[in-house]
């Protein structure tokens, strides 16, 4: 980054007055749902290996669960408190109705994909997921025994009457509502009962091989077994119907950090009640009678637009277990060996000679692990400071930090306790680190620490030298194999000083400090992005070539969107690679006709964030932990770091930006009508996938 380029906030008053038309903005929730359709399209793509298609189906289902737990819950909160609409102008009630309509189609497509496409295709290749009506006599006999021996002893059916009110139903659990006729042992007339399936029960049951006539590997859903034999829980009663259902609840933890003295304790208390918070969705078997559905809605406090009738198991994502249980390499993506860093046994010497760039998963994450392991064992290393947002359960990183602390090094770890759905794991991680003598801090009140930073202080001769790792993704060996992310390892003194100052802010009470190289949320990153967009705008107005290329997971920050519109009007050519939700509407005449938006959905989850600005012939390229979202730019601790080595910057531009702009196999283009369309190779262009090309380069 040029030191002569001051980072000053750009006045947005004129821009804010312009572009007030809600039609210029897409709705975030609907755009996020659109992404799930793109994921589901991978499950329908016959060029994708069959078990991988199954995984894509399950990912679309898991994404939808989280969408309701967080996004729909947020919209319902806005509806309850009368909050103002976003720039798209849609009121919460309108959003919820639109979400219901689009989700109904998505759910229909998901179950059609399973019932009509994937399940038959798997069966044809010897992998059967059997429904109740397809069991033969031997299979049914075995499953009845399994039910009596393994399932029935842990079930506690609850008949509904004045003494047995409707039970509390935990978030996203499998349940059966049973319609009964008859008189029980106490003379009570039965009508309805609820059977809850404990989480200890396997959701997918593999049948013994000897029960298969043709050598197939067969599985059965727990929900099918429960529905088939639930009558055995009610002897003497007649089962008129058994219908599976699942309720989804608001899972956003609410902790008033200004009012609590101990954040960890407050989060532990919140986690206890998270599974029983307000309901936001009811999934129910499609043949369930309407009166029963209304009873469930009443008990969960839901309206009709929260109901989704399904034709299959209520938690379709559970079928992902089949992927791991079926050992058929020919039905999965071929394995690959990522590049490894040469001479990584002497990693400090390598970094001291020059910056090291890694592009995961094509470059092995082991280099990052080697850096930390060698730092822990090196007697010349005096201190290690690191942020942890998400990490693996059996984390080599955590083990290295503990080893370093036990060997007498000063180790400080910023653990983000509020990492969504990893809160409990991170609480346990913090305890484990503290017990080993690591100084653990929880970041800054009111701001999630999402930055990915590692700082190592090493004595070399009479001086101390800082070694730094900065990344766009988490310190997580598992996701590093399936997410695309960038890592920079550097001994650059200015970057090291900036990172040191950031850790002072996070662990102490240091004032806001001016950084030489890095941009930081919530202080300078937002203004820095706006400054660079406006700089390209000024170049374009002077008739100079001006261009912006940016890659991220999502885009919705209003000031950034408006600044991009202004830049487009001035003639700046803008290419945005946005994997998920995007509220910017491209291709609008006289507004955004110079903006192109595409989304890449392929084998690996696109997770890297890269911003490139032409800068009048002296390009600037940044990598970041932040998307161009309001929360990332204004309400989180994030970092954005420049790639100062020209060769590394060119490599990123080629492999991470241009390659994805050339993709015509996994790319979806967003039109001015708000619709994503899958790109197809033109007749004079060869098919090209950026991810495949990068794999073939290994």
From Swiss-Prot:
Disulfide bonds: none
Any single Pfam family the record assigns to this protein: PP_kinase_C
Binding of Mg(2+), residues: 390, 420
Active site: 450 (phosphohistidine intermediate)
Gene3D superfamilies documented for this protein: Endonuclease Chain A, Polyphosphate kinase middle domain, Polyphosphate kinase N-terminal domain
Cellular component, GO, one term: polyphosphate kinase complex
InterPro entries, A to Z: PP_kinase, PP_kinase_C_1, PP_kinase_middle, PP_kinase_middle_dom_sf, PPK_C_dom2, PPK_N_dom, PPK_N_dom_sf
Example of a GO MF term: polyphosphate kinase activity
Cofactor dependence: Mg(2+)
Chemical reaction(s) catalysed: [phosphate](n) + ATP = [phosphate](n+1) + ADP
EC number, as in UniProt: 2.7.4.1
PTM: An intermediate of this reaction is the autophosphorylated ppk in which a phosphate is covalently linked to a histidine residue through a N-P bond.
This protein's record includes keyword Nucleotide-binding: yes
UniProt-listed GO biological process terms: polyphosphate biosynthetic process
Key words, A-Z: ATP-binding, Kinase, Magnesium, Metal-binding, Nucleotide-binding, Phosphoprotein, Transferase
Record: residues binding ATP: 63, 483, 579, 607
Function: Catalyzes the reversible transfer of the terminal phosphate of ATP to form a long-chain polyphosphate (polyP).
Family: Belongs to the polyphosphate kinase 1 (PPK1) family.
Protein name, entry field: Polyphosphate kinase
Naturally occurring in which organism (per UniProt): Xylella fastidiosa (strain 9a5c)
């Amino acid at each position: 980054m040029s030191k002569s380029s001051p980072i000053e906030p750009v006045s947005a008053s004129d821009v804010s007055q312009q572009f007030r038309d809600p039609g210029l903005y897409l709705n975030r929730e609907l755009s996020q749902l659109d992404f799930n359709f793109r994921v589901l399209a991978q499950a329908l793509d016959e060029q994708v290996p069959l078990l991988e298609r199954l995984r894509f189906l399950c990912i679309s289902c898991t994404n939808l669960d989280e969408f309701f737990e967080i996004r729909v819950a947020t919209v319902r909160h806005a509806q309850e408190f009368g909050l103002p609409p976003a720039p798209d102008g849609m009121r919460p009630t309108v959003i919820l109705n639109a979400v219901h309509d689009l989700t109904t189609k998505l759910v229909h497509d998901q179950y059609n994909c399973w019932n009509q496409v994937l399940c038959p295709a798997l069966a044809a290749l010897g992998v059967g997921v059997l429904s109740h009506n397809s069991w033969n006599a031997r299979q049914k006999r075995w499953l009845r025994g399994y039910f009596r021996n393994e399932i029935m002893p842990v079930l506690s059916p609850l008949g509904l009457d004045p003494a047995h009110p409707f039970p509390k139903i935990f978030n996203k659990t499998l349940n059966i509502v049973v319609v009964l006729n008859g008189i029980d042992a106490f003379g009570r007339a039965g009508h309805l009962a609820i059977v809850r399936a404990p989480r200890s029960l396997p959701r997918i049951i593999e049948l013994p091989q000897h029960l298969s006539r043709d050598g197939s590997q067969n599985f059965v859903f727990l929900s099918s077994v429960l529905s088939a034999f639930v009558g055995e829980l009610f002897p003497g009663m007649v089962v008129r119907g058994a219908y599976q259902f699942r309720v989804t609840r608001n899972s956003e933890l609410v902790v008033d950090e200004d009012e609590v003295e101990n954040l960890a304790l407050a989060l532990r208390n919140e986690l206890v009640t998270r599974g029983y918070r307000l309901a936001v969705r009811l999934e129910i078997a499609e043949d369930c009678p309407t009166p029963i559905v209304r009873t469930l809605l009443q008990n969960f406090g839901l309206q009709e637009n929260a109901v989704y009738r399904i034709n299959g198991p209520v938690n379709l994502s559970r079928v992902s277990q089949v992927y791991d249980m079926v050992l058929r390499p020919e039905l999965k993506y071929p394995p690959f060996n990522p590049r490894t860093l040469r001479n990584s046994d002497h990693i400090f010497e390598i970094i001291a000679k020059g910056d090291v760039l890694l592009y995961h998963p094509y470059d092995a994450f082991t280099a990052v692990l080697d850096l930390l392991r060698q730092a822990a064992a090196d007697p010349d290393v005096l201190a290690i400071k690191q942020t942890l947002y998400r990490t693996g359960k059996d984390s080599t990183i955590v083990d290295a930090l503990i080893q370093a602390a036990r060997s007498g090094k000063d180790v400080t770890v910023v653990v983000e306790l509020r990492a969504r759905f990893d809160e409990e794991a991170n609480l346990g991680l913090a305890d484990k680190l503290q017990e080993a003598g690591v100084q653990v801090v929880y970041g800054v009140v009111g701001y999630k620490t999402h930055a990915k930073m590692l700082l190592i202080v090493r004595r070399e001769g009479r001086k101390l030298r800082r070694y730094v790792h900065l990344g766009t993704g988490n310190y997580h060996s598992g996701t590093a194999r399936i997410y695309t992310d960038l890592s920079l390892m550097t001994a650059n003194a200015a970057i090291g000083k900036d990172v040191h100052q950031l850790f002072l802010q996070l662990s102490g009470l240091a004032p806001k400090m001016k950084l030489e190289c890095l941009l930081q949320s919530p202080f300078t990153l937002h203004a820095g992005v706006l400054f660079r967009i406006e700089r390209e705008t000024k170049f374009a107005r002077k008739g100079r070539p001006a261009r912006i290329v940016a890659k991220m997971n999502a885009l919705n920050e209003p000031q950034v969107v408006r600044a991009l519109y202004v830049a487009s009007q001035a003639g700046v050519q803008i290419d945005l690679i946005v994997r998920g939700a995007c509220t910017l509407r491209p291709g609008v005449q006289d507004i955004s006709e110079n903006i192109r938006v595409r989304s890449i959905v392929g084998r690996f989850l696109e997770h890297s964030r890269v911003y490139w600005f032409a800068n009048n012939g002296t390009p600037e390229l940044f990598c970041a932990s932040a998307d161009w979202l309001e929360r990332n730019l204004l309400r989180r601790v994030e970092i954005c770091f420049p790639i100062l080595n020209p060769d590394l910057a060119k490599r990123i531009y080629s492999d991470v930006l241009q390659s994805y702009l050339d993709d015509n196999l996994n790319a979806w283009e967003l039109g001015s009508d708000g619709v994503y369309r899958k790109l197809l190779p033109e007749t004079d262009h060869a098919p090209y996938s950026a991810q495949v090309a990068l794999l073939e380069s290994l």
